[in-house]
Amino acid sequence: MSTGRSTGATAGSAAGTRRPARPPAEPVKSLPCARPSTDWNEVVASRRPAVEGYTSIDSAVPGTDVGLYISATAARYRIQAYRMGYYGHAQACLVWTSAWQAGRVQQRVKVVGATNTPTAPWSKSMTMATKGWDPGVYLLRIDGGSRTARTFMPLVMRSPSFAGRTVLVMPDTTWQAYNSWGGYSLYDGPRHSFKNRSRAVPFDRPYDARTGAADLIPYELPFVALAEKIGIPLGYASDVDLQRFPTAFLRAHAIISVGHDEYYSPTMRETLTTARDHGVNLAFFGGNDVYRKIRFANTANGADRLEINYKDATDPIKTPSLVTTQWRETPSNNPESSLTGADYRCASSVYYPMVVADPTNWLFTGTGVQAGTKLPGVVGQEFDGINIARPVPRPLTVLFHSPVICTHRPTSQDSTYYTTPSGAGVLDIGAYYWNCAIARRCPAKIDGATSDIVTRITTNFLTAAAAGPLGKRHPAVDNVRTYYPRPRVGN
């Protein structure tokens, strides 16, 4: 493992690489929209919102009637549905506005059973028709009449077919795992107690991320907008769709895990593995992906609306295929790296630069980078790395190899790309802040040169992956031994 200091220059610095070449200056058509919106995000975050709600289903094909469950201390409210993406200077299109409804306060939270499951056992407030809507990622804004009385509900309008498309998958199982509405998440309970955490969290409750939008705005929306701007054929799905419709993904050209995508059921993981083995390209544009193992159960609102994860041996289900310890742990013993390429390395509160390892790789075309070029601030929070003591698909190319200090130990972040006999190419960016770097809206300051490079690499991958199996045109060249001549000790 290389832990030495890189001598490469920072992206765009005078002492090193030139600023990356920009994409061709061709006019890019924005998606048609009668009512593009630049004020969709005029929402004041609140720990006690005047309006909040959730949908009866997290993902549905256009034409589905969607139940809305709303609680409001505001005297009245309305729903405004925004399709999110690329609309020129706007990232939202207003597609529907409800009539004003009388506000009604519903029960705050009901915590159920030994699993500490926090539910919102609310009556349905209204039904929203979606006939004629386009597939895509939506935010439903609950408007209580002022900027301080607004929150969101995320919704995916699933594509009726994924054939020939690059499918953007929203990480709603991870959104839900971290959602602490009602005082419980899969991480903690009251007073931030890990011991009293929930072991089963339902989709039948609002998201508590201050605005109700989970992580969609900072970590998924920049990627969605860029993918739409590029103009490739896109499909849209949620994580739970990988569980419900596994065969629907087999005719896609690529499946993209957008953002932090940590929580996977056996069926979800098998859906991606089978698609890869049928020549479907995969990419993980986040870090810490496919790390936690979950299973689903039903709620009163439907199938697969309860997400179960114990994280330890207290799981009462002992069947190896269902027990919810980590994927790499007993009894699963199936590290995420066998699918993703790298695996979860560490969580850090310090921001580090990504360091270019192989600038000759096709993904760096047009970036102007050199070996050792640094992308400041992109490595942080959670990130991935290679451990050759675990299953690592080969041939595998290390694209970035970035020295990091985490939990007081030197280690490394790695971004990887491998190809398979089926022709599929699989990319693992392995960095939590990659997508927010596209829009320069990360916790760390992202400079323009770094954002340009991140955007160009993302564009290169999406454009090539949309054309079919990457391994036939861009086979991976193995360079793992350059950076890992011997197995690494520890996680």
Regions found by a protein language model. Give the residues of each.
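Helical hinge/lid and interdomain linker segments adjacent to catalytic or ligand-binding clefts
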Residues: 107-119, 125-129, 133, 212-298, ...
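Solvent-exposed loop/turn segments at secondary-structure junctions
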Residues: 162, 172-176, 241-244, 260-264, ...
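Ligand-binding face of N-terminal immunoglobulin V-set domains in extracellular IgSF glycoproteins
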Residues: 52-157
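Proline/serine/threonine-rich low-complexity linkers at boundaries of modular beta-sandwich domains
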Residues: 23-50
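Loop/turn elements at helix/coil->beta-strand transitions in domains of secreted/extracellular proteins
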Residues: 135-136, 161-167, 229-235, 250-254, ...
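Aromatic-Pro/Gly-enriched surface loop or interdomain linker
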Residues: 72-86, 92-99, 147-248, 469-472, ...
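An acidic, glycine-rich "communication" segment
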Residues: 290-408
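Extracellular low-complexity, Gly/Ser/Thr-rich intrinsically disordered linkers
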Residues: 227-229, 242, 370-489
